[in-house]
Swiss-Prot record:
HAMAP family associated with the record: MscL
Membrane topology designation: Multi-pass membrane protein
Family according to the record: Belongs to the MscL family.
Task of the protein: Channel that opens in response to stretch forces in the membrane lipid bilayer. May participate in the regulation of osmotic pressure changes within the cell.
GO cellular component assignments: plasma membrane
Official protein name in the record: Large-conductance mechanosensitive channel
Quaternary structure (record): Homopentamer.
Length: 147
């Protein structure tokens, strides 16, 4: 059983998947930081609010300065600022993955399919006949060999 597990783990696709997950997690942290630390402060400044992560609606009705203060008071909140940050994270991640896949597909060499054999015409019934045929399948006439 241990040998089977070792064989399974050492397969190329399992290792590729593990590397992909690790790189994806690290890349996700980079995108998250770019959104939270670079993009959202600029957007927040343009809209007159500095911190998007503190945009929320208190469902209890009280006034709280931050999401943390509302949570400390036990007030339920709709954290739409955090939701906007997370949505922007997703959109940027999806765009980058789309561009990477598009570039990889462009680089990947595609094999051109072999050209289909051009059928010749039977001189007797004028039907299409395979180039290597010695007899017409339609009229059964004997055909001359092609050079």
């Amino acid at each position: 059983m241990l040998q089977e597990f070792k064989t399974f783990i050492m397969k190329g696709n399992v290792l590729d998947l593990a590397v992909g997950v690790i790189i994806g997690a690290a890349f996700g942290k980079i995108v998250n930081s770019a959104v939270n630390d670079l993009i959202m402060p600029v957007v927040g400044l343009a809209l007159g609010k500095v911190d998007f992560s503190n945009l929320f609606i208190s469902l209890k009705g009280g006034e709280y300065a931050t999401v943390a203060a509302a949570k400390a008071a036990g007030a339920p909140t709709l954290n739409y600022g955090i939701f906007l940050n997370t949505t922007l994270d997703f959109l940027i991640m999806a765009l980058v993955i789309f561009m990477i896949i598009k570039a990889a597909n462009k680089v990947r060499k595609t094999e051109e399919p072999a050209p289909a054999p051009v059928p010749r015409e039977c001189p007797f019934c004028k039907s299409a006949v395979h180039d290597e045929a010695s007899r017409c399948p339609h009229c059964t006439s004997q055909l001359n060999a092609t050079a």
